């Protein structure tokens, strides 16, 4: 049970990133009602796709990575494609977290410490927990997660009493904005790259992994809804639009909330929350990347690497990009939605489709049957095509 609790918090901690706080800017022109529907729908979609991995792990060893699952049903080609997409995506995310974490750490260090030293220190300090092992990540994540929740509770306690029901009844200024916001909220429910690590940590316990995914994602959904409720209830739609014109950043949102609540505590609590959210996301993503590399070496090259070697392979490439070629990971992140959709929706749907033919009587099957698999696949593909429609001018732009 202790590992199950830790795994649940790792699911939530990986999903709840610093970007959560700026999500109301994405939904600024939509209104709370449609934002709520969108969040519930995408949570259901991505929780369903995550549970497909639980079904799959009944047919594989508990330490099998996503690449191994792909090879089991689609051969070497499946492994190559699945591993390449996942590693590129996770490397890009880690580079972004390292860069952001270094900037946060720089504010706490003497001026003589430059940007590169701050980035290096952040990587060494928090990367060490990942190198030590999942148990170590579990322990530090629990502490950070509960402090993060405390900071979030402080913010909510100051904002919720000030909300106005009329603000929550605002309707979209343009219904097309609902479609445009979908990809941003879609990726906000991403933790699927960490599922192999969690399954290994839980020794292949299907019930425990299912519980961790359902409860961890539900915690995230509740946090997203409460934050949207607080901001949309506090600010009118006109005030949101003014923020988008003057300062479409988290800082602009914090200033607007201060103007209404008059509390300086909000800014401090928001900064603490965003810092801890970045770290917990880094831990979850980093753990998933390290074990993806371990799976690749072990099963494709018959190499059993030590944790330090795996740590170097995990963190040196994104560290180099963050220090010397930031344009590289920014370019990769430009296709983050497409890569995420592939390994979080397209891949598990395809694998389960084949697994159900090969193993007709699995003890646990995700609800819905093959028709639901097709619907989920189509929705995933449609959502990832939306950014292209925005760039082409067919849909309105949103922040995010």
From Swiss-Prot:
PANTHER family: LOW AFFINITY TRYPTOPHAN PERMEASE-RELATED (PTHR46997), TYROSINE-SPECIFIC TRANSPORT SYSTEM (PTHR46997:SF2)
Gene Ontology BP terms: amino acid transmembrane transport
Subcellular location: Cell inner membrane
Transmembrane segments: 5-25, 34-54, 80-100, 117-137, 143-163, 176-196, 211-231, 250-270, 273-293, 313-333, 335-355, 370-390
Gene3D superfamilies: Amino acid/polyamine transporter I
Domain of life according to the entry: Bacteria
Name this protein carries in UniProt: Tyrosine-specific transport system 1
Membrane topology: Multi-pass membrane protein
UniProt entry keywords in alphabetical sequence: Amino-acid transport, Cell inner membrane, Cell membrane, Membrane, Symport, Transmembrane, Transmembrane helix, Transport
Disulfide bond annotation, renumbered to this chain: none
GO cellular component, one term: plasma membrane
Reaction(s) the record says it catalyses: L-tyrosine(in) + H(+)(in) = L-tyrosine(out) + H(+)(out)
Cell membrane keyword on record: yes
């Amino acid at each position: 049970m202790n590992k199950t609790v830790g795994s649940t918090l790792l699911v939530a901690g990986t999903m709840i990133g610093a970007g959560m706080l700026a999500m109301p800017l994405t939904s600024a022109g939509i209104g709370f009602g449609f934002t709520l529907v969108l969040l519930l729908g995408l949570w259901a979609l991505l929780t369903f796709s995550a549970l497909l991995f639980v079904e799959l792990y009944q047919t594989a060893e508990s330490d099998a990575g996503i690449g191994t699952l792909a090879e089991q049903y689609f051969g070497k080609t499946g492994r190559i494609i699945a591993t390449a997409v996942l590693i590129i995506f996770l490397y890009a995310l880690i580079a972004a977290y390292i860069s952001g974490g270094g900037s946060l750490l720089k504010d706490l260090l003497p001026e003589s410490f430059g940007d590169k030293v701050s980035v290096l220190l952040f990587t060494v300090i928090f990367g060490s927990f990942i190198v030590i092992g999942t148990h170590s990540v579990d322990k530090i994540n629990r502490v950070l997660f509960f402090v993060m929740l405390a900071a979030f509770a402080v913010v909510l306690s100051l904002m919720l009493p000030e909300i106005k029901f009329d603000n929550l009844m605002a309707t979209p200024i343009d219904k097309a904005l609902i479609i445009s916001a979908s990809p941003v909220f879609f990726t906000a429910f991403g933790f699927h790259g960490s599922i192999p690590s969690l399954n290994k940590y839980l020794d292949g316990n299907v019930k425990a992994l299912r519980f961790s995914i359902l409860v961890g994602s539900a915690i995230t959904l509740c946090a997203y809804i409460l934050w949207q409720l607080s901001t949309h209830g506090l600010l009118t739609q006109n005030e949101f639009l003014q923020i988008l014109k003057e300062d479409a950043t988290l800082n602009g949102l914090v200033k607007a909330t201060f103007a209404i609540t008059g509390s300086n505590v909000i800014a401090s609590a928001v900064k603490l929350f965003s810092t801890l959210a970045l770290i917990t996301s880094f831990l979850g993503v980093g753990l998933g990347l390290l074990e993806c590399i371990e799976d690749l070496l072990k099963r494709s090259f018959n190499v059993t690497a030590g944790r330090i070697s795996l740590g170097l392979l995990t963190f040196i490439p994104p560290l180099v990009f963050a220090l010397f070629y930031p344009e590289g990971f920014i370019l990769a992140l430009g296709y983050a939605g497409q890569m995420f959709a592939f390994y979080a929706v397209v891949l598990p749907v395809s694998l389960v489709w084949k697994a159900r033919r090969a193993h007709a009587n699995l003890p646990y099957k995700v609800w819905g049957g093959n028709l639901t698999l097709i619907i989920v696949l189509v929705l995933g593909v449609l959502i990832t095509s939306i950014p292209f429609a925005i760039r082409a001018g067919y849909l309105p732009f949103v922040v995010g």
